[in-house]
């Protein structure tokens, strides 16, 4: 029996990166419309169930993101200060964890690439990377289920009406 995830979506253990997942989804809308929505992390909680809260942190390029994972009766919360560290309108965006304290923190990274397809819509690729030691098989299963739901919600957000329903 084959793995339920396609090869590109399987978690990979790489040197220097504990977890890396590639998520691909096709969306209706122009690259500019999709980019405008995906460049703001506050919008991500509309489709990603493991994002509990997102608050801006002194501007439009940094956010305090609270992640929440529940495995059975156990829940874990994790707060991250995420910063948009790179953007190339309308092709790509990269967010990275950038805490302001002097402590050493695990890396979190989200790289979004938007490619216009011939005809209508775009292909969007999101690469999520985490270098911390607290990842586990149960968390992987929770994350994967949220990703599958997020794909559907994203497609609904960018339905064939020509653009995002998020402002």
Predicted regions and their residues:
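Short strand-connecting beta-turns/loops that link adjacent beta-strands
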Residues: 30, 59, 89, 117-120
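Short, surface-exposed coil-to-beta transition loops
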Residues: 20-22, 77-81, 104-111
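Compositionally biased, intrinsically disordered linkers/stalks adjacent to structured regions
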Residues: 147-157, 164-167
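Short, surface-exposed charged micro-motifs
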Residues: 53-55, 83, 109-113
């Amino acid at each position: 029996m084959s793995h339920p995830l396609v090869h590109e979506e399987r978690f990979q253990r790489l040197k220097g990166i504990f977890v890396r997942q590639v998520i691909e989804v096709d969306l209706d809308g122009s690259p500019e419309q999709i980019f405008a929505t995906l460049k703001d992390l506050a919008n991500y909680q509309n489709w990603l169930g493991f994002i509990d809260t997102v608050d801006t942190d002194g501007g439009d390029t940094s956010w305090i993101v609270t992640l929440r994972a529940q495995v059975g009766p156990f829940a874990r919360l994790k707060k991250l200060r995420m910063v948009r560290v790179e953007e190339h309108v309308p092709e790509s965006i990269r967010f990275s964890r950038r805490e302001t304290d002097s402590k050493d923190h695990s890396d979190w990274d989200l790289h979004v690439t938007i490619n216009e397809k011939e005809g209508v819509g775009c292909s969007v690729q999101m690469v999520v990377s985490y270098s911390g030691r607290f990842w586990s098989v149960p968390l992987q299963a929770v994350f994967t289920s949220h990703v599958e739901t997020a794909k559907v919600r994203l497609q609904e957000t960018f339905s064939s009406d020509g653009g995002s329903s998020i402002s």
